[in-house]
UniProtKB/Swiss-Prot annotation:
Binding site for Fe cation 2: D83, D166, H227
Entry similarity comment: In the N-terminal section; belongs to the zinc metallo-hydrolase group 3 family.
Protein known as: Anaerobic nitric oxide reductase flavorubredoxin
CDD domains listed in its UniProt record: flavodiiron_proteins_MBL-fold, rubredoxin
Organism expressing this protein natively: Aliivibrio fischeri (strain ATCC 700601 / ES114) (Vibrio fischeri)
One CC-aspect GO term: cytoplasm
Lineage: Bacteria, Pseudomonadati, Pseudomonadota, Gammaproteobacteria, Vibrionales
Length: 496
């Protein structure tokens, strides 16, 4: 099956309605995808990209219905990933020796995937041109790390079509190919989802590459992507949208996501969200349970947000595994100009909140005061959680707020906290921690682990964790773990 694009250019790709996972399980496809391949028939015949390897036979069979494969003069591979070059090996069995134009990095990747170093590779550089007859040329533009080192774009003069590779694309499958034919809300949602989950780490490169392409002053009548719709109606709209997304994008939105063992952290999330709306009814607050909702939806919401709040119960003195995985994804996506805070419930020890706070700080977020609640939050603790949400709303507001609320109650409680994490005990007000002074008694005070009865002796210390002899308990690091049961400092009590 072919779809006419413009003049002597046709789409010869493959739709995939059933695919649900991309990059392993990194990206969940909710609308399928398409593998877009294009056939240009001027004096020279050019094939731009192939399809995923699972459709190799069908792709070649369809192509043979349109042309004699031997008439293909050149193959252009904009990207070596298997969903672009997957059918290349099967095609080259039919037409060995056909010149392949791609970047130097693509040669390395294609050979690594297909193991055919003897293929007729022709490496290109930005600005190189290939004459295809009838007064038309293909002009190549390298686009490294958008989103692989081998990536490039190809521009067809005369028809003013930019074959943009993954840029400006979407994992979106529809019987209709052009952007003006499909549901606009679905289309832009999928564009945003694609950018947020795949291209966000390369935003600075996106801006630089778009400006470079625009500096060539070439007309762009169509943008033919590698996945999803071809942009023929106002094609530069997606270029301008990319420039906006790449520029530290944020909306007036706060994303809260959490995982909870016994529903306690979920209760905190609900109360915090209510507190935010008490103060700033205009802000969009989105709440997600990472165990039940799609992670790519969550990451897309994070991309759109001015700030995020991450909650977890404490398990084995660390955060819940799915929260740890989400924070690893967030660190890799390298979000910029966003605020963050941690919260969570615990029983013996509240190590999860401390770790989340640290991970968010390391990931480049401007971190706010965190919040811990011991056991199941009661009415007073829920009130404090709600006030914490009010404080967050005030601190993160993008414009002056007109809503009145208990300013003294919120500000005083948060400002009195010197540590990065606030401890909320049921039926207890927040109080400023007492200043720790090392006394002679403290220097000799042994501490008992209330769980396993291991004893910390200051005279001995704990060399395996870098705690030197003669270190008083007050100077032992907060991330110290009992060597026997691996719980934190919170479970230790003084030996009377």
């Amino acid at each position: 099956m072919t779809i006419h694009i413009k003049n002597n250019v046709n789409w010869v790709g493959q739709r995939d309605w059933e695919v649900s996972d991309f990059h392993g399980t990194e990206f969940k496809m909710t609308k399928g995808t398409s593998y877009n391949s294009y056939l240009i028939q001027e004096e020279k015949t050019v094939l731009i990209d192939t399809v995923d390897h699972r459709f190799s036979h069908q792709f070649i069979q369809n192509l043979e219905m349109e042309i004699d494969l031997a008439s293909i003069d050149y193959i252009v591979i904009n990207h070596a990933e298997e969903d672009h070059s997957g059918a290349l090996a099967a095609l080259m069995e039919k037409i060995p020796g056909t010149p392949i134009y791609c970047t130097e990095n693509a040669i390395d990747s294609i050979v690594g995937h297909h193991h055919h170093p003897e293929w007729n590779f022709n490496p290109i550089k930005t600005g190189d041109a290939l004459d295809i007859g009838n007064g038309k040329q293909l002009i190549f533009v390298e686009a490294p790390m958008l989103h692989w080192p081998d990536s490039m774009m190809t521009y067809l003069t005369g028809d003013a079509i930019l074959f943009s590779n993954d840029a400006f694309g979407q994992h979106y499958c529809d019987e209709r190919l052009f952007n003006d034919e499909v549901d606009q809300t679905e289309l832009m949602d999928q564009c945003l989802r694609y950018y947020a989950n795949i291209l966000t780490p390369f935003s600075a490169l996106v801006t630089a590459k778009i400006k470079e392409v625009l500096s060539f002053n070439l007309p762009v009548d169509m943008i033919a992507t590698s996945h999803g719709c071809v942009w023929r109606d106002n094609p530069t709209q997606i270029i301008h949208q990319y420039l906006e997304w790449a520029d530290n994008y944020q909306e007036d939105r706060i994303t809260i996501f959490y995982d909870s063992m016994s529903n306690n952290t979920r209760m905190m999330a609900d109360a915090i969200a209510q507190g935010i709306h008490d103060v700033d009814p205009a802000v969009a607050v989105k709440v997600f349970n990472v165990s039940r909702q799609d992670k790519n939806d969550i990451l897309t919401s994070v991309f759109r947000s001015k700030g995020i709040l991450v909650g977890s119960s404490t398990m084995n003195n660390v955060m819940m595994p799915k929260i740890a995985g989400m924070l690893e994804e967030i660190a890799g996506l390298r979000f910029r100009a966003k605020k963050a805070g941690a919260f969570g419930s615990y029983g013996w020890n509240g190590g999860a909140v401390d770790r989340i706070h640290s991970r968010l700080t390391d990931a480049g977020f401007e971190t706010a005061v965190g919040l811990k609640a011991k056991w199941r939050p009661d009415g007073q603790a829920m009130k404090l959680c709600r006030e914490h949400g009010q404080f967050i709303a005030k601190q993160w507001a993008l414009a002056p707020l007109t809503t009145t609320f208990n300013t003294i109650n919120v500000d005083k409680k948060i400002q009195t906290i010197e540590e990065p994490v606030v401890l909320v005990e049921p039926s207890a007000e927040l109080e400023k921690p007492a200043t720790e002074v090392t006394s002679s008694k403290d220097a000799k005070q042994c501490m008992l682990c209330s769980v396993c009865n291991w004893v910390y002796d200051p005279e001995i210390g704990e060399p395996n964790q870098g705690v030197e002899p003669n270190t008083p308990w007050s100077s032992v690091p907060n991330d110290f773990l009992c060597p026997e049961c691996h719980l934190g400092k919170d479970v230790f009590v003084e030996i009377k």
